[in-house]
């Protein structure tokens, strides 16, 4: 049996348990190693954060005052990277509390190690040395302290101007019209279309008139990362009925294509400023017998497996009705 099928079956089974996220964490830590915070993974995440920030600076020519990340995950790498580059007010939101105190201390220690090795600038060209030094001191203090878990992780993060919240955008009315940069990193592909529409609408409501949104979307089959024998288009061969048997709440993949996302952006009041999409080859797609649902898509949209999209509010022109 293909290893991706084993992983999918395991996560499908785990999703039925009350403590599914805890069980899935054990599975990822002990069996798949996907929660190992290696230097390469850390640098990759920091680079992504830098790219979100560069998208804003390219359009607005300055640092954003207020940043909102959707989808914190286990490790607050991107918010910490934004802090290191000079951002002052950073909010990070997750609908499920995945991050633990030990995850935060591991992240701080890993970033501090890169600082000691002089490697932070590889991923963060705009890193501020004084902030990196302060982060390193905090990491050392937490490592030395016998009460390393006594300080609430949210308190530690606030020391870097980072506000960690669990819930939905509805719990953040205080940000309405204030967010300069909103961003997500490999999040949208794990949401249903209706959930994406609700999220994008909420981000549009919170966005400042001059705000910018930056989204990294991984449109490919995520099981291809785990099992190199399958291509990123593998999941396009399944009908919706069959895919629903494979898909799980713990690792939901919508299979939406880039053209679907474009429509969702437009429908929720956003205008695409930049789109940088990576496409595979016809040879890579050829072995996949497309399900009828995907046969109607243009080939150039089907081939997209990753995309960086930068948006700004689609404001009505002066003199036009609201």
Predicted regions and their residues:
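Class I S-adenosyl-L-methionine-dependent methyltransferase module
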Residues: 84, 88-163
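Acceptor-substrate binding/catalytic loop of class I
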Residues: 244-258
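A short glycine-rich, Lys/Arg-flanked "PGG" loop and its adjoining helix->strand segment in the class I
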Residues: 197-212
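A short SAM/SAH-binding and catalytic strip from SAM-dependent methyltransferases
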Residues: 180-194
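Conserved class I S-adenosyl-L-methionine
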Residues: 63-74, 212-239
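A C-terminal cap/extension of S-adenosyl-L-methionine-dependent methyltransferases
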Residues: 164, 263, 272-322
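A short acidic, Gly/Pro-enriched loop at the edge of an enzyme's catalytic core
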Residues: 170-182
């Amino acid at each position: 049996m293909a290893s991706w099928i084993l992983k999918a079956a395991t996560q499908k089974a785990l999703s039925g348990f009350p403590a599914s996220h805890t069980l899935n964490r054990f599975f990822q830590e002990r069996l798949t190693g996907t929660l190992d915070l290696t230097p390469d993974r850390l640098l990759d995440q920091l680079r992504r954060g830098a790219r979100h920030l560069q998208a804003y600076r390219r359009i607005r020519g300055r640092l954003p005052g207020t940043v909102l990340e959707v989808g914190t995950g286990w490790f607050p790498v991107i918010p910490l990277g934004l802090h290191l580059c000079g951002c002052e007010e950073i909010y990070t939101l997750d609908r499920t509390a995945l991050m633990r105190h030990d995850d935060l201390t591991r992240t701080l220690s890993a970033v501090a190690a890169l600082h000691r090795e002089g490697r932070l600038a590889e991923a963060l060209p705009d890193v501020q040395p004084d902030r990196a030094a302060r982060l390193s001191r905090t990491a050392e203090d937490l490592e030395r302290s016998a009460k390393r878990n006594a300080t609430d992780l949210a308190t530690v993060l606030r020391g870097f101007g980072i506000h960690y919240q669990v819930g939905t955008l509805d719990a953040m009315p205080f940000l309405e019209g204030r967010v300069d940069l909103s961003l997500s990193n490999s999040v949208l592909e794990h949401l249903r279309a209706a959930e994406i529409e609700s999220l994008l609408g909420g981000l549009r409501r919170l966005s400042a008139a001059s705000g910018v949104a930056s989204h990294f979307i991984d449109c490919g089959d995520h099981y291809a990362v785990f099992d190199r024998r399958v291509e990123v288009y593998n999941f396009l061969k399944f009908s919706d009925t069959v895919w629903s048997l494979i898909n799980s709440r713990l690792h939901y993949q919508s299979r939406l294509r880039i053209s679907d996302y474009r429509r969702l952006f437009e429908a929720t009041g956003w205008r695409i400023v930049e789109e940088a999409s990576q496409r595979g080859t016809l040879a890579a797609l050829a072995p996949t017998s497309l399900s009828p649902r995907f046969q109607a898509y243009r080939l150039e949209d089907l081939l997209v497996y990753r995309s960086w999209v930068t948006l700004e509010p689609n404001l009505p022109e002066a003199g036009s009705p609201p």
